[in-house]
């Protein structure tokens, strides 16, 4: 598999690690070709090649070609070159079948971005997107054969519902609203803070927890300007005792403890393009009521009222969503019941099996034929 990979701290790295474990659980042999993306941290043993940029393309391609099949995780920002166009140079020279997982599908790409996706599609045996809306965009806006596109949901691990109380926060004395993940512009945290300001003084006034480090690429370019602006707004609104910013990349145990302590999850993202959210799927798996802005992945997952959708940049809508869930135990329990009907199909073990089925279909084999030797 060619992807960013832990200890790199980003969503795609975490996704790649989870998918790798799931594929291995289902019988595949995997090697990791790690996109370093400016990260100098030491790679785990499973990484057999570190790719720092275009200078490494020949070495990476040579290694990938020694496998039965390659899986490539794609996001414009993780490859070298203009809009990450080095991925095209890699794909042009891969001789084994390729499955490319598209983590972003833009409705209005630049000419260069559209060309890159079209080239990815041309050189891949299969494309994976995680939502039906992603597939629809690919078919409508790009030169992509619909039969080549597979919709496989973002996987999630089981969340420990009985985790001990978190040590990252003071003792809980009122309802807790949670947002987690890497932080940066576009996450919409400022709108959730404004929603908390609207709730202050009302009968329903929870505490709000924002957990996660600043995204490494954001920190590289902008430092902590976004986080500092959030702190300024929190202080201006007089919410210093009501909003907690946890500047930490959480391990699974810490995250489980935090999720278990929450009464609901808020995803206030600005983007109207986001077709994938690992946090959304994890919240769903944990059975936590969700208030989310109206981005594509949320629309698809929460269509059956297993959460509340609000407009982007709408503090009033977020506040009303929080008020509705905390104020109605019946409504919250109904959301949890709807979520529970979806979760088994989202477990990583099930998702890994779906990827193996795609792998065998493009190689013309049945799933039980052999153990795949996959470059991931």
Where are these regions (language model features)?
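A charged, aromatic-enriched C-terminal amphipathic alpha-helix characteristic of glycosyltransferases
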Residues: 10, 330-360
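A conserved mid-protein helix/loop that constitutes part of the nucleotide-sugar donor-binding site
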Residues: 13-14, 184-198, 203, 316
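Short alpha-helical donor nucleotide-sugar binding micro-motif in glycosyltransferases
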Residues: 121, 256-262
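Donor nucleotide-sugar binding/catalytic pocket of nucleotide-sugar-dependent glycosyltransferases
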Residues: 122-161
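Conserved donor-binding/catalytic core segment of Leloir-type glycosyltransferases
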Residues: 169-187, 193-196, 208-211
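Nucleotide-activated donor-binding/catalytic signature segment of Leloir-type glycosyltransferases, i.e.
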Residues: 222-249
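Short hydrophobic beta-strand element within catalytic cores of glycosyltransferases
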Residues: 265, 285, 289-292
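Conserved acidic donor-binding segment of nucleotide-sugar-dependent glycosyltransferases
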Residues: 304, 308-315, 324-329
């Amino acid at each position: 598999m060619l992807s960013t990979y832990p200890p790199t701290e980003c969503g795609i790295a975490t996704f790649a690690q989870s998918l790798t474990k799931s594929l291995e659980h289902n019988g595949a042999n995997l090697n990791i070709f790690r996109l370093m993306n400016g990260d100098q941290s030491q790679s785990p043993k499973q990484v057999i090649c570190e790719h720092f940029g275009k200078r490494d393309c020949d070495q990476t391609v040579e290694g990938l070609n020694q496998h039965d099949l390659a899986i490539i995780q794609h996001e414009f920002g993780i490859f070298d070159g203009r809009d990450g166009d080095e991925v095209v140079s890699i794909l042009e020279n891969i001789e084994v079948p390729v499955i490319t997982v598209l983590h972003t599908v833009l409705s209005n790409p630049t000419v260069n971005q559209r060309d890159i996706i079209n080239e990815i599609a041309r050189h891949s045996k299969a494309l994976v997107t995680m939502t039906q809306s992603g597939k629809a965009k690919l078919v409508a806006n790009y030169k992509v054969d619909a039969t080549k596109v597979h919709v496989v949901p973002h996987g999630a691990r089981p969340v420990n519902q009985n985790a001990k109380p978190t040590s990252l926060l003071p003792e809980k004395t009122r309802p807790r609203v949670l947002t987690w993940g890497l932080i940066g512009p576009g996450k919409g945290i400022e709108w959730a803070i404004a929603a908390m300001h609207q709730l202050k003084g009302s009968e329903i006034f929870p505490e709000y927890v924002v957990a996660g480090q600043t995204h490494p690429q954001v920190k590289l370019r902008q430092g902590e300007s976004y986080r500092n602006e959030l702190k300024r707004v929190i202080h201006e609104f007089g919410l210093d005792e009501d909003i907690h910013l946890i500047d930490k990349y959480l391990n699974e145990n810490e995250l489980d403890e935090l999720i278990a302590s929450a009464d609901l999850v808020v995803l206030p993202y600005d983007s109207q393009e986001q077709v994938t959210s690992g946090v959304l799927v994890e919240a769903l798996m944990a059975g936590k009521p969700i208030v989310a802005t109206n981005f594509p992945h949320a629309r698809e997952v929460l269509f059956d009222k297993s959460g509340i959708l609000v407009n982007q940049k709408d503090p009033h809508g977020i506040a009303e969503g929080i008020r509705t869930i905390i104020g109605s135990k019946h409504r919250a329990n109904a959301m949890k019941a709807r979520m529970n009907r979806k979760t088994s199909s989202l477990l990583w073990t099930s998702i890994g099996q779906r990827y193996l089925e795609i792998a065998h279909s493009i190689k013309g084999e049945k799933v039980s034929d052999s153990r795949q030797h996959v470059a991931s």
